[in-house]
Amino acid sequence: MTNMTPVALGLAALLALAGCANQVQAPAAASQSVAPVQVYAAGSLRGALNAVASDYEARTGQKIALTYGPSGLLRERLEKGEQAQLFASADTEHPQRLASAGGWQAPSVFVRNGLCALTSEKVNATPATLLDTLLRADVRVGSSTPKSDPSGDYTWALFRKADSVQAGAYARLDSKTLKLAGAADSPKPPDGISVYGWLMDQGRADVFLTYCTNAVVAQKEVPRLKVVQVPPELQVAAAYGLTLRLGASPSVTAFAQALLAPPAQAVFRRFGFSLP
C-alpha cells in the first residue's frame, strides 16, 4: 500500500467527499439556473482565486460568488450564520474550528505561502540583516492583526523564532509592532488597491511583514517599495486550509475538487503560492 502524508490524507478525504476525481462532474454549461457557489476566502488569495474561478465559470457555466477578507473575521461571520458553502482560509485553525463545532468538513491544505518583508526605500535590509533591521528603534514595523488575520499569527510566530536567534527579540518586537491591517476597524484602502502597498505608501510603517504573495503585489503597485526574503531560521510556513459544508451540493464539491486539480494548482503557483 502506498504511504500517504497527513496532508495527502486530507486531500484524499476531500476528494472522497467530492465523490472522487473520476465520478464528480462539473455542472453543465447549460445549467444556468444553478445557484452560485458561495465562497469565503482569505484576502491573500484574491488574484489567484479570481483567475481560477473565472476559468471555471467559462468552462462549466457554474457561477462562483467570491467574498474576501481576513480569515478570522470570515470565520466569525460563518459562525453567526452567514451561508457560504466553501471556506478557503490562510490557515487551518479557523476552518478546523468550524469543523469542530459541527457542520463542516475537516480542512485540507490546498496551497502554501510564506512571509516576506515589504520595506520602504529608506530601509536597506537584506535577509541576513532583516532581524537587526526589525529590532532597530528607528524602524516602524507593521503587521496584520493576530487572531483576526492569520498573517498576524504567522508574524508573531516569526517573532518567537527570532527569540531563539537573539535573546529578548520577541519582547521587543511584540511591544513595537503596529497592528495596521486585518482587524474589523483597520483602515481600508480604496477598492482594488493592495492594503499593504497603500499603508506603506501612506508612510504608516517602514517595514511590513506579510505574505510573500501580498508583498509582490504591493511592490508592483508601489515600485519604490522593496521585497526582502525572510531568512530560513525565521521563516514560518503558511498552510492554507480548505473546507466545505457537510452534505454540500454537487456544484460545491465539484468546485472544491477543481481547486485541488492540476490546472488550478498551476494558477496558484503562477501567483507565487507553493504546492500543498
Task: Name every feature range the model reports, one short phrase each.
Residues G102-S108:
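Central helical "cap/lid" subdomain
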Residues A13-L14:
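Residue-level signal for mature regions of secreted extracellular proteins and peptides
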Residues A8-L9, A106, P231-E233:
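Residues embedded in well-ordered secondary-structure elements
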Residues L17-G19:
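C-terminal motif of bacterial Sec signal peptides marking the signal peptidase cleavage site
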Residues A21-T67, S71-G72, E76-K80, D91-T92, ...:
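Exported/periplasmic ABC-transporter solute-binding proteins
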